[in-house]
Regions:
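A membrane-interface helix-boundary motif in multi-pass transporters
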Residues: 17-28, 93, 128-133, 215-242
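Hydrophobic core of transmembrane alpha-helices in multi-pass small-molecule transporters
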Residues: 69, 156-173
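Cytoplasmic membrane-interface "Motif A"-like loop-to-helix N-cap segments
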Residues: 121-138
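Symmetry-related core transmembrane helices of the 12-TM Major Facilitator Superfamily/SLC fold
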Residues: 6-8, 26-35, 137, 143, ...
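Intrinsic disorder in cytosolic terminal tails and internal cytosolic loops
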Residues: 125, 252-274
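Loop-to-transmembrane helix entry/capping segments in MFS-fold secondary transporters
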Residues: 94-99, 187-197, 231
Length: 274
C-alpha cells in the first residue's frame, strides 16, 4: 500500500514535469530512480530499523542529505556547460578548453578536496559543526564568488582565474560531507550511509543540474537571447539553489552535537547490541 502511494506521488510529479517540459525520457528515468530509492528507504525501515532511524530520523542527517546534493547540482551543471560558455563568450577553441579547463579542474578540485578535509578536521577540533562551516564557506561562499567572477568577467584570463577559484570552493564539501554522514550512524552501517550520500549527489546533482541549466538556457534563447547571453544568464540564475544549503547546513550544525552524541544511546533503545 505504501509503495503504491509512493509510486502514485512520483508518477504524478513526473507526469506534471513531462507536461511542462515535454522531456519524456528525462522524467521517466528520474521517476524510476526516485521510486527505487524511495522504496529502498521504506524497506530499510522493515529490515533494519536501527539503520533507518539513525539515517532518516536524525535532524542533522536529514538536513545534511538536503544540503549536500545542492552543491554538486551547480558543479555538474557548470562542468557540462563551461565549454559552451567559453566558446560563445570568449571565442576559445576546443583545444584551449580541453587543455586549460582540464588543468584548472584537476588542480582546483585537488586543492579543494584536500584543503577542505584538512581545514574541516582542524575546525572540528574547536567546533562540533566545524566541517559544515567549511562546506558552507567553500561550497556556497567561495563557489558564488568564483561563479559570478567567471561568468561576468570580460577578460578571458580573469574569467579563468575565477574558474579556478570556483573549482577549489565547489570541491571542498566532498570529504567533510562524507565524514559528517558516517559519524551520525553506527560503524556497521557507515558504508550504507556513505553510499546513500553519494546516491543523493547523483539523483539531484548529476541528474538534474545539467538538465536544469540547459532548459533555462534554451528558454532564454527562445525569447531572443543570443546563445552566449542565454548561457551566461542561466549560469547565474542556477546559483539560486545555493540558498538551500545556506539554510540546511546551519540547521544541520545546530543539531549535530546532540545527534552525534546520542548515536549509541538511540541504537541501544532500538535493541542494537553494542
Amino acid at each position: 500500500c505504501i509503495n503504491a502511494l509512493i509510486a502514485l506521488v512520483i508518477f504524478s510529479l513526473c507526469f506534471a514535469l513531462y507536461n511542462l517540459t515535454g522531456d519524456f525520457l528525462q522524467w521517466t528515468a528520474w521517476g524510476i530512480g526516485t521510486y527505487l530509492v524511495s522504496t529502498w528507504i521504506q524497506s530499510l525501515s522493515k529490515r533494519d530499523i536501527v539503520a533507518f532511524t539513525l539515517m532518516f530520523k536524525s535532524k542533522a542527517a536529514i538536513y545534511s542529505f538536503i544540503a549536500f546534493p545542492c552543491i554538486p547540482f551547480v558543479g555538474y551543471a557548470y562542468s557540462a556547460f563551461t565549454p559552451s560558455f567559453y566558446i560563445n563568450n570568449h571565442g576559445m577553441s576546443a583545444l584551449e578548453i580541453g587543455t586549460l579547463i582540464g588543468l584548472i579542474t584537476a588542480i582546483g578540485s585537488f586543492i579543494g578536496v584536500i584543503g577542505g578535509g584538512y581545514f574541516g578536521d582542524k575546525l572540528r577540533d574547536k567546533y562540533v559543526g566545524g566541517r559544515l562551516y567549511v562546506i558552507f564557506t567553500g561550497g556556497v561562499l567561495i563557489t558564488l564568488v568564483g561563479c559570478f567572477g567567471m561568468i561576468y568577467s570580460e577578460s578571458k584570463n580573469i574569467s579563468l582565474i575565477f574558474n579556478f577559484i570556483y573549482h577549489v570552493g565547489s570541491s571542498v564539501y566532498v570529504g567533510c560531507a562524507a565524514t559528517t554522514v558516517t559519524n551520525l550512524v553506527l560503524p556497521r552501517m557507515r558504508a550504507m550511509a556513505g553510499a546513500f550520500f553519494i546516491l543523493t549527489l547523483s539523483m539531484i546533482g548529476l541528474a538534474l543540474g545539467p538538465y536544469t541549466l540547459g532548459r533555462i538556457s534554451d528558454a532564454f534563447e527562445s525569447q531572443g537571447y543570443a546563445a552566449g547571453d542565454a548561457m551566461q544568464t542561466s549560469m547565474a540564475l542556477i546559483l539560486i539553489i545555493l540558498i538551500i544549503p545556506s539554510i540546511a547546513l546551519f540547521l544541520a550544525a545546530k543539531n549535530l552535537k546532540k545527534d552525534e552524541e546520542s548515536v549509541f544511546e538511540r541504537a541501544r533503545a532500538l535493541g542494537q547490541v553494542i
